[in-house]
Curated annotation (Swiss-Prot):
Domain of life of the organism encoding this protein: Bacteria
Similarity remark: Belongs to the acetokinase family. PduW subfamily.
Protein name (record): Propionate kinase
Function: Works with phosphate acetyltransferase (pta) to capture exogenous propionate and regenerate propionyl-CoA during degradation of 1,2-propanediol (1,2-PD).
Pathway it works in: Polyol metabolism; 1,2-propanediol degradation
Any one Gene Ontology cellular component term annotated for this protein: cytoplasm
One GO term of the biological process aspect: acetate metabolic process
Cellular compartments annotated: Cytoplasm
């Protein structure tokens, strides 16, 4: 068995991919090696961009790619042309990131016609993502009919939330008839980093109380107890929760009809306002990018500094509430683009949490060590590089091929 597995994230105009070798062909033993990774951008345009990286070598070309099918065909040809594989038959499994599994999917699943139909039906909950995810599945099933296909849902990890954590206090029929509830997102990332952290701590994940902070242009916090998601900050949509790059996060809902009536905005315009014009961008007036706002704050821009403090304060408030819900905390995780790379963001968030045992070591934080808490601190603070693609590949092994997977530590 070749053991090559592809992880796919299909977007409306993009296709992100990684190819892994998950089994040693000589010994049959489990191992994890990235063979290549890449991204197709501007699908549907005459100047689409195809990026492929194999080890330290990178190729980039501009060409017309009309749709996802053409993109997939070009990608698979490139794998052979650049000697990544000798034959498409070597790819034994494909894992697809799917945005929304609703209440139907509490785990990754082997894709059947019935599963694919349900993914498309759940497009009512994720109209921008599920339909294109489903299209990507169909395209790769045609291109690689021999390969097992597995759907990995962003929402699945959070299906362990209790009713008191996922219900909104609205009339019951809105949950029963329309499925309005907290679903949460970034589940694959939170699941991966919590497993890595537990492995590095040398303790079983089931014994730990963890708060995971996935901080990027989209940000979410997750309370993890006994290895399961107990609560998460994103809700019915990824708009909910903490302040983000361009999203407001949680606000008083009555603000929205007030703005509608005062400024005569439509529902579409209001949705654009809270999703695309708010957050760091809205408060700073500069950028949605944390690095740009941070630089402006360093140069004396008061609104930029305020945006950073508001960002940290909203996150601290959620961390505190989750510690209460978990009955304590053993580890605080930072992941995502901001969480992994911004030492100042980590410092600002942890600064007011020392009374909870969250005591940051400044030198370790500056050096981006894995554990950055003070030596005597009761709570571990970890920087964990997320790897959703690897988690997807592992789920293909587990779900489709019924093979055991390595501890998460293998890639950290």
């Amino acid at each position: 068995m070749s053991g090559k597995i592809m992880a796919i994230n299909a977007g409306s105009s993009s296709l992100k991919f990684q190819l892994f070798s998950m089994l040693n062909e000589q010994t049959g033993q489990h191992h994890e090696q990235v063979l290549c990774q890449g991204l197709i951008e501007r699908i549907g345009m005459d100047d689409a961009i195809f990026n492929l990286r194999v080890g330290d070598v990178q190729w980039r070309e501009t060409l017309p790619i009309a749709d996802c099918r053409q993109g997939a065909e070009h990608l698979l040809r490139a794998l052979i042309e650049h000697n990544v594989i000798d034959s498409l038959d070597e790819i034994i499994g494909v894992g697809h990131r799917v945005a929304h599994g609703g209440e139907t999917f509490a785990d990754s699943v082997l894709i059947t016609p019935q599963v694919l139909d349900k993914i498309e039906q759940l497009g009512t909950l994720a109209p921008l993502h599920n339909p294109v995810n489903a299209l990507g599945i169909r395209v790769f099933q045609l291109a690689l009919p021999h390969a097992s296909a597995v759907a990995v849902f962003d929402t699945a990890f959070h299906q362990t939330l209790s009713q008191t954590s996922f219900l909104y206090p609205l009339p019951w029929r809105y949950y029963e008839e329309l499925g309005i509830r907290r679903y949460g997102f970034h589940g694959t990332s939170h699941k991966y980093v919590s497993a890595v952290c537990a492995e590095r701590m040398g303790q079983p994940l089931a014994a730990l109380r963890i708060v995971s902070c996935h901080l990027g242009n989209g940000s979410s916090i997750c309370a993890i107890g006994h290895g399961k998601s107990v609560n998460t900050s994103m809700g019915f949509t990824p708009q909910a929760g903490v302040m983000m790059g361009t999203r407001s996060g949680d606000i008083d809902p009555s603000i929205l009809p007030f703005i509608q009536q005062t400024e005569g905005k439509s529902a579409v315009e209001i949705n654009h306002l809270i999703n695309n014009q708010s957050g760091l961008l809205g408060i700073s007036g500069i950028s949605h990018d944390y690095r740009d706002v941070e630089q402006a704050a360093d140069n004396g821009n008061r609104r930029a500094a305020l945006a950073l403090e508001l960002f940290a304060e909203r996150i601290r408030a959620v961390i505190g509430s989750y510690i209460v819900q978990l009955g304590g905390i053993d580890a605080l995780i930072f992941t995502g683009g901001i969480g992994e790379n911004s030492r100042s963001a980590r410092q600002q968030i942890c600064r007011e949490l020392t009374f909870l045992g969250i005591e940051l070591d400044q030198e370790k934080n500056i050096r981006n060590q894995f554990f950055i808490q003070q030596d005597t601190a009761p709570v571990q603070i970890a920087i964990v590089n997320t790897n959703e693609e690897l988690m997807i590949a592992r789920d293909v092994l587990r779900v489709a091929l019924n093979l055991p997977v390595q501890p998460a530590l293998a890639t950290q």
